[in-house]
Amino acid sequence: MKSTNRPSVLLAIAVSAVSLSAAAQNMKPGQYEYTTKTEVFGITIPVSFKQCVTQKDVDSNSAYVNQQGQKNCTPPDVKRNGKEMSVKYTCTDPKMSFDGTGTVSEDSFSFDMKVIQHEMNNNVMRTKLTATRLGDCK
């Protein structure tokens, strides 16, 4: 199996999984600033971006998790309990498992995700994501 650009692929999967989800009960639609820090192979990769979260995103949980999933991945299993949220899914190519937990409020959320890369000696990648509402969408 090729390992070229593997950290980039894994980061893209993790960020898209985390960054496109919302809290149906608590999160208020609007413009959010997302900040992620992903640690893989001893390197920390920071990413920041802004995203407009709509009421549809909130109602479908897609502000936190890409509900279509990634190619070769199961759809995310999203569970909500009040302000707490958990997400799990697996991928077959490359073979990985994702397990994350987070806390949601009306104008912010935080999320921690652990990704196990099974084809790379069960290497663990961790992503921490925070998002803060900046105001209405522009």
Task: Give the positions of each predicted feature.
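Bacterial N-terminal signal peptides that target proteins for export
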Residues: 1-11
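N-terminal signal peptide c-region/cleavage motif recognized by signal peptidases
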Residues: 19-21
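Cleaved targeting-peptide boundary
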Residues: 23-31
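Short beta-strand segments that buttress and anchor functional surface loops
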Residues: 34-37, 86-93, 112-118
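Short, surface-exposed coil-to-beta transition loops
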Residues: 46, 94-100, 112-114, 123-128
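Central antiparallel beta-sheet cores of small beta-barrel/beta-sandwich binding domains
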Residues: 46-101
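Extended lipid/amphipathic-ligand handling interfaces
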Residues: 100-104, 133
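Edge beta-strand at a domain terminus
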Residues: 119-138
